[in-house]
Amino acid sequence: MRALAIAATGMDAQQTNLEVIANNIANINTTGYKRARAEFTDLLYQTERMQGVPNRANQAIVPEGANIGLGVQTSAVRNIHTQGNLIETGNKLDVAIIGQGWFQIEAADGSTLYSRAGAFNKNADGNLVTVDGYNVIPNINIPTDAQDITITRTGQVTARIGNAADFTQLGQLTIANFANEAGLKPLGDNLFSQTPASGAPVVGVPDDPSYGYVKQSYLEGSNVDAVKEITDLITAQRAYEMNSKVITTADEMASIVSKNLK
């Protein structure tokens, strides 16, 4: 009985949907987190009767066919790269990107990763790093006697060194754009890597045309909408229950047939 197998694919799809929603809710307070959405496509169809072929008398064309779908499958889990809410922190090394762009982060193996989480700090060498200690690209070194650190909307990092009256430029933040942000691969720890689907990064200066700008002492919160996630959770739960009901009904029908054959 095909209904059993079809409903099973529906339950499996809704299980995936529930897991994606659960992960969104779990990361509702994660800096720079981008909510995900499960997307589904129908499976193959079994043709019971072809459309567009001559009828039995060969006098007319059959206008409609009979194609029975065999279920559903998960086609993608897409990250939605919309702007998250801004959170004021008062920390001079916290930076939020407003608009398009990704911070460039140097991974342990020397490769470049990308993040929207601008919760930066200084390491023992004075280099600007992420909360996990990865260097920001390009490298920006902040002397121990630096005061009044300022990061402009264009990414220029300046500070007064020691008792100097004038500001000294310490470096320039750059950000990367991608042709297809949905093609970036999430790695955890607020990091993404480029893939052939995302295209190569195009690096530029904040506030240039087609690039967002940066805001000091702010962080970008997650773009998870709690109300929407709870609504989607209820919808997924109901769909799961209905597929379960189909399996129960198909099993009862098969049971009736088997009893009548005795």
Curated annotation (Swiss-Prot):
It is found in: Bacterial flagellum basal body. Its main location: other. Keywords: Bacterial flagellum. GO terms for cellular component: bacterial-type flagellum basal body; bacterial-type flagellum basal body, distal rod. One of its GO terms (biological process) is bacterial-type flagellum-dependent swarming motility. It comes from the Bacteria. Pfam families: Flg_bb_rod, Flg_bbr_C, LlgE_F_G_D1. Belongs to the flagella basal body rod proteins family. The basal body constitutes a major portion of the flagellar organelle and consists of four rings (L,P,S, and M) mounted on a central rod. The rod consists of about 26 subunits of FlgG in the distal portion, and FlgB, FlgC and FlgF are thought to build up the proximal portion of the rod with about 6 subunits each. PANTHER family: FLAGELLAR BASAL-BODY ROD PROTEIN FLGG, FLAGELLAR PROTEIN. This is Flagellar basal-body rod protein FlgG. It comes from Agrobacterium fabrum (strain C58 / ATCC 33970) (Agrobacterium tumefaciens (strain C58)). The lineage of its organism: Bacteria, Pseudomonadati, Pseudomonadota, Alphaproteobacteria, Hyphomicrobiales.
